[in-house]
From Swiss-Prot:
Function comment: Forms part of the ribosomal stalk, playing a central role in the interaction of the ribosome with GTP-bound translation factors.
Family annotation (PROSITE patterns): RIBOSOMAL_L10
Taxonomy of the source species: Bacteria, Bacillati, Bacillota, Bacilli, Bacillales
CDD domains the UniProt entry points to: Ribosomal_L10 (cd05797)
Pfam families from the UniProt entry: Ribosomal_L10
Descriptive protein name: Large ribosomal subunit protein uL10
Family label: Belongs to the universal ribosomal protein uL10 family.
Length: 166
């Protein structure tokens, strides 16, 4: 009997540490997906560095209470899977949202973004943001614009002076 309790404590500790360490977490209802569809989703998430696990709701509730995210308890009913990301805040939401568009059975229930409980709408809004690389390229183009404009203006002045001198 105590062996089963010890095993459950280990699982609760594992879930607790994943909630603490993750930058972004998404809880989904995967009821209605075939095994091949779940495998495809797992592969996409794994390629992005996201861990996708299924835990018992009672064990997840205990872990959620330990990390003081009790707002998630309302969403821990039925078959749930949890996607944890330690690296990219946007990746799990983006991948799951894209997958849900082509697989209606997959339903986003809630999420945790940087330690705060997020609603379905917030998770979907996060999914619509560009990736980190996309944001960096946008920032770079904004930073380059004044320099580019100055270079073009300088070139135009040089061309004008050259025409006047010729």
């Amino acid at each position: 009997m105590s062996n089963a309790i010890d095993t459950k404590k280990v699982v609760v500790d594992e879930i607790t540490s994943k909630f603490k360490d993750s930058m972004s977490t998404v809880i989904v209802d995967y009821r209605g997906l075939s095994v091949s569809e779940v495998t495809e989703l797992r592969k996409q998430l794994r390629d992005a560095g996201v861990e996708f696990k299924v835990y018992k709701n009672t064990l997840t509730r205990r872990a959620v209470e330990q990390v003081e995210l009790t707002g998630l308890n309302d969403f821990l009913t039925g078959p749930n899977a949890i996607a944890f990301s330690n690296e990219d805040v946007i990746a799990p939401a983006k991948i799951i949202n894209e997958f849900a568009k082509s697989h209606e059975a997959l339903e986003i229930k809630a999420g945790v973004i940087e330690g705060n409980v997020a609603t379905v709408e917030e998770v979907k809004a996060l999914a619509e943001l560009p990736s980190r690389e996309g944001l960096l390229s946008m920032l770079l183009s904004v930073l380059q614009a004044p320099v580019r404009n100055l270079a073009l203006a300088t070139k135009a002045v040089a061309d004008q002076k050259e025409e006047q001198g010729a």
